[in-house]
UniProtKB/Swiss-Prot annotation:
Molecular function GO terms recorded: manganese ion binding; RNA binding
Protein species of origin: Saccharomyces cerevisiae (strain ATCC 204508 / S288c) (Baker's yeast)
Biological classification of the source: Eukaryota, Fungi, Dikarya, Ascomycota, Saccharomycotina
Protein's name in the database: Exosome complex component RRP40
Domain of life assignment: Eukaryota
GO CC term, one of those recorded: nuclear exosome (RNase complex)
Amino acid sequence: MSTFIFPGDSFPVDPTTPVKLGPGIYCDPNTQEIRPVNTGVLHVSAKGKSGVQTAYIDYSSKRYIPSVNDFVIGVIIGTFSDSYKVSLQNFSSSVSLSYMAFPNASKKNRPTLQVGDLVYARVCTAEKELEAEIECFDSTTGRDAGFGILEDGMIIDVNLNFARQLLFNNDFPLLKVLAAHTKFEVAIGLNGKIWVKCEELSNTLACYRTIMECCQKNDTAAFKDIAKRQFKEILTVKEE
């Protein structure tokens, strides 16, 4: 279901149905009332096997604003006595990553990250007047849940709308198109960053170029042809 919606509008989803909230939607912690906070197109996915729907607002914005439960990719830009300073987007405020925000972390057992390292994390706190905080584990289970340090691979900057489509829209074909050509690992950040890694560097480069071109053209019907051409060009250069 897709509906154009404004801030303050009623939320057109059955309140008795479990809903996973994405960007542009706020849940009042006191009343549990769900309401939109951005103007855009509301997308509500069909129920999955777990019976949970996913809802998010697709709105136009070039600046990323951290929101609780957002998946993000950050770059370590500084270290302090008890936390790391992380950049989520150029020319935007940094966020904080505690030394304890990792699986099984303790004062004696904590990860050692260097400036320039990439991390995949979840936004755990985001207050207007305070620095946002991220964590590299699932606080409900204590496990990494796919979060942590991103080693090797390539990082791609895309627009925020493209990242939201890739993460939330199950019908968005890009990942299936790439999977038809190679095996790969991917991390998608709602801050407009995508990390991709393949066993061979040539395939990683082909994935990088495919994602970049698909983001620029944003024509889902052309994704297959774009991927086919990019992988063919990389393979030709490799053979030469």
